[in-house]
Amino acid sequence: MRGFRSHSRAWLAIASLVATALVLPSPALSQDASPAASGEATRSLTREEFAAQQQEELQYTEAATPGGTFIDANTADIQTVQPLLAEEEFTIEVLDLVYDTLVGGSLWNGQIAPDQLADYWEVAADGRTYTFHLNKNATWHDGTDFTAADVQFSADALANPETGSAYTGNFIGTFESWRAIDDDTFELIATEPTYTALFEILSFYIVPKHLWENVPLAEWRNDPGASGTDPSRVVGTGPFKFQEWIQGDSVTLVRNDAYYGKVPYLDSYVLRVWPDQTAMVNALLNDEIDAAELEAPDIAAVEGTPGITVVHYPTRGFSYYEFNLDPEVTTKWQDQRVRQALLYALDRESIVDNILLGYAEVAQGTQPVVSYAYAPDQVTTNYTYDPEKATALLAEAGWTDTDGDGVVDKDGEPLAFELLYQTGSPLTDQLVAYLQDAWSGIGVAATPRSLEFPALIEATTTNPTFEMALYGFSWNASFIQDFMFGCDQYQVGFNDMKYCNEELDAIYNQAKRTFDEEARRELLIQASNIVNDEQPVAVLYFNQDHDGFRDVVQNYRPSTWGEDLTQVWIQQ
């Protein structure tokens, strides 16, 4: 992953710095990263200027022996090879090697940076008009020239709900128009000056017009260029070219020697899919793979193994369960006291200490530890473990055990539901068992059901008939969270819950227009408190990531903000 990407859904990997645009003044122009804050035009760093900064910060070494294959691993397969349809984190990380966006992000502080298809960009004095100067050497993997017409085509597709992208809502809510000025220049005009405009295009992958323009948008998801069954249709501009996806087994990419940026040292990248966490960790210990994301119980064994390095770092991610608030599906969750009761029934300190072995932070609100709006001391509702309060809240909402069967009921309906979660992780199984037991203690009956990740997505988004689902999620570096909690994000964003609070929407909109960091921070704290009070989702804890990798893998530096596989090389 070359830099961070935008918000993405993560399979449940139980596992700041505010990001602004890196800018330089154009002649007589402002240094400020926020054009609306100064009323003057600004220009970003150039690709070359940013590359020099990156090398100074990260001190990558030159490969002694270029070549070789980096074998990555995961316990779930990717979803698709069509990047505009990708929703979850690992799919995006893999496709990020094949496809490019207009802008990327720095790996040391999360700032937006010119390391993708735009060599640099300018923001006009109106704070709304973004002009991107595209790399003239970029070509599609099939040899076709890349032009601004491809960017316009991709923007048109992303903006159309028929495409089925989870990023449509925020894109069309941010930009009012776009156009190709010429082959090498593209313009985006925001509806108003906003702090978040560049963050919204981190998920705006560019796809080849010549391969997709004759495919109806509604058919993209089932096209051979999305399933990978026709590799000639899986064509990007990135540092690696798609070779093969054997679903449920592996993805193979090969180096793009014609890449316009830093050509990878590696000959190829392979993702291997393992049936479960135990099998994947054993593969790392047996040198069958080069890297794997570890869960807390794996750390002690792997960390002491000669030839393997383990790194730990905080993430922008969190683990949570979400309620389906659509009354046509279920009426159980309409009273927020019921939703609050379920969280009071959980000893999250115990979850962190005994299941995660201390490698997480109990969540207080929705802003993660790495966010500039992280403020655990300012939460308005602190859900400390209190099963008696949980029982009292249920009773206030009319849920009591009237028939003595151990399950509370109301109007003859028991408070019983199905909890969906992703299969494949012993640690997730352990968490689910704890949730079920803790809720049983207050008379609430949860029936867990594990699903493969694509089926989980189907049950919560495409056909949202679920009652509750357990997930992980990763915020983008703006930390403005409307793409999950905004009223207009149901089925065009990540608002699976059908949650809507107009006051919250107004706060998010104000935060987007607020360029002063401290003022924006206060707004985001307000927003976090509203969500934390109303509980459309229950944020359990903020994740840490733990990556284990073989010592022969050089320049591999996973972090909060991603890693750069073009720099990785294998020591022979």
Identify the residue ranges that each predicted region occupies.
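N-terminal lobe/hinge region of extracytoplasmic solute-binding protein
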Residues: 46-58, 70-125, 156, 233-237, ...
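Detector for C-terminal structural segments
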Residues: 53, 246, 250, 255-257, ...
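Alpha-helical secondary-structure segments
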Residues: 71, 147-154, 185-189, 238-239, ...
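Gly/Pro-rich hinge or "lid" segments in bacterial periplasmic/extracellular proteins
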Residues: 106-108, 204-264, 268, 387-392
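Aromatic- and charge-enriched surface segment that lines or borders ligand/interaction sites
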Residues: 119-164, 181, 187-189, 280, ...
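Ligand-site clamp/hinge motif
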Residues: 135, 228, 256-302, 433-436, ...
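Extracellular/periplasmic solute-recognition and catalytic clefts
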Residues: 158, 177-179, 243-254, 270-330, ...
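Surface-exposed binding/hinge segments that line
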Residues: 169-219
